């Protein structure tokens, strides 16, 4: 019983970590807002809709986070 849900759960969180790694590698190219040292605003990776790459990363991150949560509930 628990083998498949554990594998699916692990795959979901592997995708979550991959999205964070991609965001780290691409830096400001996938940021949703530009960093502004004068206003002390940091770049975000998962908010906004002006940048298509930002929106795609958010959607994939959200999907796999929710899917992982569902698999966690199935395991319990």
Swiss-Prot record:
Family matches, as PROSITE patterns: G_PROTEIN_RECEP_F2_4 (PS50261)
Pfam family, one: Frizzled
Membrane spanning residue stretches: 6-26, 55-75
Single GO MF annotation: G protein-coupled receptor activity
Residues listed as glycosylation sites in the UniProt record: 33
Cellular component GO terms, alphabetical: apical plasma membrane; cell surface
Cystine connections: none
InterPro entries assigned: Frizzled/SFRP (IPR015526), Frizzled/Smoothened_7TM (IPR000539), GPCR_2-like_7TM (IPR017981)
GO biological process, one term: nervous system development
Cytoplasmic side: 1-5, 76
Membrane protein topology class: Multi-pass membrane protein
Cell location: Membrane; Cell membrane; Cell surface; Apical cell membrane
Chain's role: Receptor for Wnt proteins. Most of frizzled receptors are coupled to the beta-catenin canonical signaling pathway, which leads to the activation of disheveled proteins, inhibition of GSK-3 kinase, nuclear accumulation of beta-catenin and activation of Wnt target genes. A second signaling pathway involving PKC and calcium fluxes has been seen for some family members, but it is not yet clear if it represents a distinct pathway or if it can be integrated in the canonical pathway, as PKC seems to be required for Wnt-mediated inactivation of GSK-3 kinase.
Family from the record: Belongs to the G-protein coupled receptor Fz/Smo family.
Name of this chain's protein: Frizzled-3
Species this chain originates from: Gallus gallus
């Amino acid at each position: 019983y628990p083998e498949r849900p554990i594998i699916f759960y692990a795959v979901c969180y592997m995708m979550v970590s991959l999205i964070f790694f991609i965001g780290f590698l691409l830096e400001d190219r996938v940021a949703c807002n530009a960093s502004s040292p004068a206003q002390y605003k940091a770049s975000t990776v998962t908010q906004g809709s002006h940048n298509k790459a930002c929106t795609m990363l958010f959607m994939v991150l959200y999907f796999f986070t929710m899917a992982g949560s569902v698999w966690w509930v199935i395991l319990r």
